[in-house]
Amino acid sequence: TAMDMEQSNTATSGGLNSSAQMTIGMGSLGTVQFNDVSGSAANAIDDILPKAYEETWDGTSHSSSFHSFGSSTQSGSVDYRLPALSFGDMSLSLTATYDPNAGSGPASAGGVAGNDHSGVAYTAKIDSGMGLAVGGGIEEVTTASTATGASDLTRATGYVTYSNGPLSIGYQEMFQNTENAGDST
């Protein structure tokens, strides 16, 4: 049976997305999170800029890949999230993500996952405690190709945001080695 949702979408129409994560908190040792569908820490910083509704590119037709950071390690992966380290008002947050089958989601119950290579992602964020935050990350997927010139896929992003009362501004850049991306995965 289909579950009726807002705007006439049903659970079988493809008009909605469900994401589930399992988190194991270990106190001062941090958190381990098992990710399914956009759950990784890397995928969470694909677009960190302030927004009133959603990302500025939401609902548009485009070929931009700036928001693809974390997309290869977001489903079927495992995160380790270090507890925030505090230095007065400042804090430092670090994460590491491992995906044994980067670019593919986990296998269905009783199934076998596709044969993609592994990927890793790392993120860091420094929060000043006074509205300024600086962060970034790197994501790498090992090559699945033995073709001459094939190399690993690498994505990186960095951002700065500032909030003071109702005012929020930000700047973010993203890099992807597009020349090699076709040879990877």
Which residues does each predicted region cover?
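Outer-membrane beta-barrel proteins
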Residues: T1-T185
